[in-house]
Swiss-Prot record:
Reaction catalysed by this enzyme: a UDP-3-O-[(3R)-3-hydroxyacyl]-alpha-D-glucosamine + a (3R)-hydroxyacyl-[ACP] = a UDP-2-N,3-O-bis[(3R)-3-hydroxyacyl]-alpha-D-glucosamine + holo-[ACP] + H(+)
EC number in record: 2.3.1.191
Species this protein is from: Neisseria meningitidis serogroup A / serotype 4A (strain DSM 15465 / Z2491)
KW Transport (keyword) present: no
Protein role: Catalyzes the N-acylation of UDP-3-O-acylglucosamine using 3-hydroxyacyl-ACP as the acyl donor. Is involved in the biosynthesis of lipid A, a phosphorylated glycolipid that anchors the lipopolysaccharide to the outer membrane of the cell.
Entry-linked CDD domains: LbH_LpxD
Domain of life: Bacteria
Protein name: UDP-3-O-acylglucosamine N-acyltransferase
GO cellular component, one term: membrane
Assembly: Homotrimer.
Keywords noted in UniProt: Acyltransferase, Lipid A biosynthesis, Lipid biosynthesis, Lipid metabolism, Repeat, Transferase
Active site as annotated: 241
GO biological process: lipid A biosynthetic process
Amino acid sequence: MIPATYTLSQITARLGGEWRGEDTSVTAVRPLADAQAEHISFLANPKYKAEVHDSSAGAVIVSAKAADGFEGRNLIVADDPYLYFAKVARLFSPVVKARGGIHPTAVVEESATVPASCEIGANAYIGANTVLGEGCRILANAVVQHDCRLGDEVVLHPNAVVYYGCTLGRRVEIHSGAVIGADGFGLAFAGDSWFKIPQTGAVTLGDDVEIGSNTNIDRGAMSDTTVGNGTKIDNQVQIGHNCKIGSHTVIAAKTGISGSVTIGSYCIIGGGVGTVGHIEIADKTTIGGGTSVTHSITESGKHLAGIFPMSTHKEWARNAVYIHRLSEMNKRLKTLEQQLSDGKDTQ
């Protein structure tokens, strides 16, 4: 594929911002340290200003505040350099559109609705009574079981699976190995064994949701597990049955959300977070990586973390001993407080 080429004036005409210096041409985005004359880079954090002076980049995206320090360089001045960089990167890597057609090895059930604009890859499967929107891409070995509804321009990457009865909004993207709508982990103890509770709900994903590789979103026990518009979920995340996740929330890799958790909109959840079930997390909550969330978070905008920062093994071992002694130390402290209080009373 021939790389796209844009001048700075062409970029700003499309995306806004102000170009300064020469109206040079660029063919790709690169980090400051790797960029060459044909590349455009960006400065999002002022502490890396020295790297701009050392960089061979043909142009750099900067904020108005930072631009004054780079006279003689080719610049694009933007309000948010990082967001602007992302939009420039999209110019050079446009969304792939569906090539209409069904591969000869794909299986599409007769009762399925597949518009001519959809692309169905090798060995893909479309189940009975499933309806695809315009321009969907169901790539090699991907599976959409029966009675599903997919909006326009949905993409299922190779080996992604959508179980029966699920609903995906417009422009949803499901990466390889992800499973949408497998049975939730619902069991009732029968005295000497576990009885599986039928999971009769499904999964509903809003518009512009993205699901990373090998992530699982379980179907609801009775009502649907839901994910709101614009939410992005990383690789290897587990979303339990009956969860309700709001719009424009992001969840990083290896996080586990237990069943029946409600998460608000615009939340940021770091990697390796774990939650107990049946709790609520308010809008705009930020949870640091590795945190164990054991109770509801009811106040919007809280920033929470629950792990020790990295330390030497010797320091960690010493602190671990102190943790085990906290209960004993608390009792001793209460005894001392009581003794002090008794002493004051006798004076």
